[in-house]
Curated annotation (Swiss-Prot):
Disulfide bond positions: 69-116
Alphabetical list of PROSITE patterns matching this protein: SOYBEAN_KUNITZ (PS00283)
Keywords carried by this UniProt record: Disulfide bond, Signal
Signal peptide: 1-26
A Pfam family recorded for this sequence: Kunitz_legume
Protein known as: 21 kDa seed protein
Transmembrane domains' residue ranges: none
InterPro entries found in the cross-reference section: Kunitz_inhibitor_STI-like_sf, Prot_inh_Kunz-lg
Cross-referenced PANTHER family: CYSTEINE PROTEASE INHIBITOR 8-LIKE, KUNITZ TRYPSIN INHIBITOR 2
One Gene Ontology molecular-function label: endopeptidase inhibitor activity
UniProt family annotation: Belongs to the protease inhibitor I3 (leguminous Kunitz-type inhibitor) family.
Organism: Theobroma cacao (Cacao)
Length: 221
């Protein structure tokens, strides 16, 4: 009887370990672009709605009325407009693959000269009382994971079969208390479509910004 019990416990331990190992691997699986390639840090991508046509265009740098700097994160209305390319940087600088559920910086790479001297790294702005929103803006800090840069770290999670959603729930500081929420689309008073913390996430996909980049990424595999 003791032998049978020991075998059952051993089997349970092995099964549990295998299960949790699988869950851990799934939680850290690579984010894939529209070509099915792993997202790479430092490579430029367009962030496009996973819903074509009525889903709108790509994410881009924008400006709020009466505020030239820092810039804000907006979505272009036309699905023919890819927006502004972004690059990703991991909190774990040793990993050059962008993975789901891990902390990343997201930084716009402007295609033209800017008037602002602020950074184009995404950050969660202070609460907007008039709009009742936590908007995603720019002027974040790249790298330096820790309590002083909490607002600059985002996560990418699966959303449906082909899409991904953005989430704010930084884990770069174990002792810090922080917000945890999905990120969705909301219109501001100017009618611009912006990103903000939301109970209703929006699904996105990532497209390489040029054929040259596609060739470089494919050469790594």
């Amino acid at each position: 009887m003791k032998t049978a019990t020991a075998v059952v416990l051993l089997l349970f331990a092995f099964t549990s370990k295998s299960y949790f190992f699988g869950v851990a691997n799934a939680a850290n699986s690579p984010v894939l672009d529209t070509d099915g390639d792993e997202l790479q840090t430092g490579v430029q991508y367009y962030v496009l709605s996973s819903i074509s046509g009525a889903g709108g265009g790509g994410l881009a740098l924008g400006r709020a009325t009466g505020q030239s700097c820092p810039e804000i994160v907006v979505q272009r209305r036309s699905d023919l407009d890819n927006g502004t390319p972004v690059i990703f940087s991991n909190a774990d600088s040793k990993d050059d693959v962008v993975r789901v559920s891990t902390d990343v910086n997201i930084e716009f790479v402007p295609i033209r000269d800017r008037l602002c001297s602020t950074s184009t790294v995404w950050r969660l702005d202070n609460y907007d009382n008039s709009a009742g929103k936590w908007w995603v803006t720019t002027d974040g800090v790249k790298g330096e994971p820790g309590p002083n840069t909490l607002c600059s770290w985002f996560k990418i999670e699966k959303a449906g079969v082909l899409g991904y959603k953005f989430r704010f729930c930084p884990s770069v500081c174990d002792s810090c208390t922080t917000l945890c929420s999905d990120i969705g689309r909301h219109s501001d008073d100017d009618g611009q479509i912006r990103l903000a913390l939301s109970d209703n996430e929006w699904a996105w996909m990532f497209k390489k910004a040029s054929k040259t980049i596609k060739q470089v990424v494919n050469a790594k595999h």
